Amino acid sequence: MRRILSILLIMFCFCVSQGQEFRCNVSVNYQKLMTTTQAYESGGDKKVFENMKQALEDFINGTKWTNIEFEQQEKIECSFSLILNQRTSATDFVGQITIQMKRPVYNSTYTTGLFNYMEQPNFQFAYNESMPLEFDLNNFSSLLSSTLAYYCYVMLGMYFDSYSLYGGQPFYETAQQVVQAVDVAKYSGWDSKGGRNRYWFMENHINSAYSDLREAYYNYHRLGLDMMTKDQPKARQAIIAALQNLQRAHKRSTSMLSLQQFVDVKIQEIVSIFTPAPDQEKKQVYELIKDISPINVVKLKGFNTK
């Protein structure tokens, strides 16, 4: 924790670094291609998919995404799952991405979910196992590498926001650059059309109108979870403050993708934290969740006290 906080003080300084930022586990599920006629010719060639998994893992874990030096034990734990639904040519695929990330909680062995997001099942991309994945922020290389880079910067933004107020700003700005470099006329999911895509997920974090969402990450994690072993009542109040942040953000936009992602990831944890809390706090949490994410109210059984 102390090293993470010290990193935040020097994160804008250039330094030579040895280790990369992520410890990401990648899985590629190709079962549909083995059992349907959608598989293109060599759709049953397992080696292609094994190479794809390794290429994605090497790209995420081997790329230097920041100028910050991470020790081995400080690397960010995440997972990237790709379910392949179609293979339309030797190098063209359609699939669905799921990304998850965890964050350690100070002075404990507990890790908390920070990001858990499943995209729509229409991710179209090209992968040629004879060509390495490359990424250049200034020049578009491929949809696959840009998508991976986008989520790496988003995860860095969330991670550092959870340690320092608006600490993830430079990474969100870089993710925005990735979005802007993609040809939206050619690739879907990167422009303002629709509400559940990469453009809007980034807009929710980069637009100052939704700063309460960013503050919620800090209040919930740094002032809440990280302080649980020191002062539980005060830590719970910080988590309530985070929910109030989300409530204010929700009032500005009732369809914020990032806000719903936050609540979906945290709801079971919130239940565990406030189950032993005073009834007044339970009632307060219930009313906030009812306003922010009505679909999750059913998980707060017993919180609506009289």
Q: Where are the regions a protein language model picked out?
A:
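Bacterial Sec-dependent N-terminal signal peptides
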Residues: 1-24
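Start-of-domain marker
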Residues: 20-94, 107
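A cross-kingdom marker for long, charged
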Residues: 25-29, 217-306
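Soluble non-cytosolic domains of exported or imported proteins
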Residues: 43-51, 142-147, 257
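Sec-exported extracytoplasmic/periplasmic mature domains
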Residues: 57-65, 157-161, 271, 275
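Acidic/His-rich structured neighborhood in mature extracellular/periplasmic domains
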Residues: 89-203
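Flexible, glycine-rich surface segments
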Residues: 164-255
